[in-house]
């Protein structure tokens, strides 16, 4: 029976399905409310060459019928665990999410754990990476003592004498005591910790006065941990809810999921997961990722998901708290998660662009496709970036044998008098190669310009002027602003999407040179902003930082009204100084 016949015979009932290859290996496990409808979608879609690997590899399938969706969820989980299929989302079993819990016992106690515990009375987390969770735990034990010992010791334990145990070691502790302490801990994790900090500061000062410097340092470390866990974010968030935000990014080969955990208005933790993308159903992949996340984490009040994901395709246990973005604050969350996914995927490309042993193959292929007459051992890549046609920065990055040579990366300041892409590229290349000729520095075997025919012509004009015989090619992007085309030495456009290793390599070059150029104009932009504000007598760094964080650009500050400025500065005298200065 061929594969199509197997699909046609599927039932409309809920269940799990397994795709197998010619070696009878399970390569993908999925679940469905309607098996026939779900599996049929894999073979009815119009996939491109890149995303049909999964489909091409399937030779036969198996399936299990279940009574309801909850059963299929459990079965899917067990099947994935058993077979570990290569096309499923498989989060690392060793991955941990730090939590501080309060146990659900007659005499509860604190514990530091590596995942959410369903049976606990309280779960606080996931805690911020770098927050020194154990130090926070010590602070809680000192300030809001619960049981610290095994209990029922018939005598006070050492911790009781240190005021760190409830006394369950030798007496019956009233439940109201624990209720009060736990309420205080709840407030602590909501960020209501001014009183806590004041107590710690007094203890630190007392220890210092008594020359107990080690004790004072330990308390100081605890205060630092409190500052970390309750630190304000760059985005103003007004909510008392626990919010998780998921988003993703896909390129030609991989998919990256990112989950941001917000606890009481603060971003406390980020999870990211990258895997090969071979045309799997996106809703299924996201579902699988979320299920594995929540095996180890507490359900939030709200889970924000991207609008393009079908909410109804989520599992029942996720539907209860899942939502699309409904306001500006939600939009900020979703965009931030998206940006994190994009950045993570870009970093993955940069770190894995060339596997050891592939360099020769990639450069040989580049030589052939580009029609160049010389093996491109040394490649120099050029790009130009700007913001609003100001702060124009050129960048050159260098690769030797397909590996970046970071100490040879250079940035070039380009005057705003050069208004066209042609003039800017010409200026940068002339400046670079005149200096390298003068200092007898090594020249490249190949120049790659980020751009099209205009940038290539600018490069060729400079090389002709300097009598240099160096091959020049270009890299251009598609409508989605992703690397797609190579322009060879004959100025022919070649789609490189299907040359996997070369495509990944050139994509990484384009990402790296773009980021390097942007880092240059950002620095100049920030410096100019700081310089203009700080030149005003009476304006300090703190005021400058407040203005920059809120208004973003110097033009926005200049155009702001008195009330708008004073709302941020909260000092009428300084506000008048700034306004009068910009009117000069």
UniProtKB/Swiss-Prot annotation:
- Alphabetical keyword list: Cytoplasm, DNA damage, DNA excision, DNA repair, Excision nuclease, SOS response
Q: Which domain of life is it from?
A: Bacteria
- Where would you say this protein principally sits, based on its record? cytoplasm
Which Cys pairs does UniProt list as disulfide-bonded? Answer: none
- List where this protein forms a coiled coil: none
Please report the stretch or stretches of sequence annotated as the GIY-YIG domain. Answer: 12-89
Cellular localization per UniProt? Cytoplasm
Under the cellular component aspect of Gene Ontology, which terms does the record hold? Answer: cytoplasm; excinuclease repair complex
Q: Which SMART domains match?
A: GIYc
The answer to whether the entry has keyword Iron-sulfur is: no
Q: Which PROSITE patterns match?
A: GIY_YIG, UVR, UVRC
Q: Which GO terms describe its biological process?
A: nucleotide-excision repair; SOS response
Start and end residues of each UVR domain? 194-229
Database matches in InterPro entries: GIY-YIG_endonuc, GIY-YIG_endonuc_sf, GIY-YIG_UvrC_Cho, RuvA_2-like, UVR_dom, UVR_dom_sf, UvrABC_protein_C, UvrC
A single GO molecular-function term is: excinuclease ABC activity
Which family does the entry's similarity section mention? Belongs to the UvrC family.
Q: How does it assemble?
A: Interacts with UvrB in an incision complex.
Q: Which HAMAP family match?
A: UvrC
Q: What is the role of this chain?
A: The UvrABC repair system catalyzes the recognition and processing of DNA lesions. UvrC both incises the 5' and 3' sides of the lesion. The N-terminal half is responsible for the 3' incision and the C-terminal half is responsible for the 5' incision.
What is the protein's name according to its record? UvrABC system protein C
List the taxonomic lineage.
Answer: Bacteria, Bacillati, Mycoplasmatota, Mollicutes, Mycoplasmataceae
Q: What gene codes for this chain?
A: uvrC
